[in-house]
Amino acid sequence: SALLVGYISLLRQRKFMGYSLTISFQSGTFQVFITASPIVLISVMGVSPQLYGLYVMFIPAGFIIASFVSGRLVTRIPVNMIILAGNIFGIAGALMQVFLATSGLATPLLIVASIFISNFGTGLVFANCYALALSTVPPSFAGAASALGGFFHQGWAFVLSFFVASLIHTSSLPLGIMQTVTTICAVSIFVFAVLWSGRHTRKV
């Protein structure tokens, strides 16, 4: 009963929900790629499994580099601005996917480059959002908050994986569209649930 009350309380906290859902939707770009890339790169573009493994090996580099950069910037720039920059990188990488697919310029290397950009954005968002999400709740709710955030993250990953596997058969366009949708959701939630809410609260 107490646990249920705690979860209900967390669901009512706008900033906690804003940060948690921002993480979930932003990291969806990587989940979309992991689900779709074997179909797009191996089945559609004819990349060998060995070369595919090499391509995928470089994908986490974007996240790793962004985490390092974020650690350097966090004492100089407001954390929310770093998160917003991560959202913008995510959208840029997703739109690059759409452009490559619609222009006929898509190659395995360029597709991997676009997800590198998106993953760089996720690296700027991930740790900062988690830290701020937990900072908005009482210490006694930290465990429940972490579990609820993980539920949103994995739940959205499940939904994306289902739709991506159903849509992608002959083109990388659905990959770009799904990435664009999830990144636009991420930045919209962050702006309205976190940034706008914070300004409104200060005015009140």
PLM region descriptions:
Residues 1-20:
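Juxtamembrane intracellular "pre-TM" segments in multi-pass secondary transporters
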Residues 14-56, 62:
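Extracytoplasmic gate region of multi-pass secondary transporters
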Residues 24, 57, 61, 116, ...:
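Transmembrane alpha-helical cores of Major Facilitator Superfamily
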Residues 60-64, 68, 158:
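Residue-level signature of mid-helix packing/kink "hotspots" within the transmembrane helices
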Residues 66-80:
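Helix-to-loop junctions at the C-terminal end of transmembrane segments
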Residues 81-129:
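C-terminal transmembrane helical hairpin of 12-TM major facilitator-type secondary transporters
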Residues 129-172, 178-179:
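A late C-terminal transmembrane helix in Major Facilitator Superfamily
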Residues 181-204:
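Multi-pass alpha-helical transporter architecture, strongest
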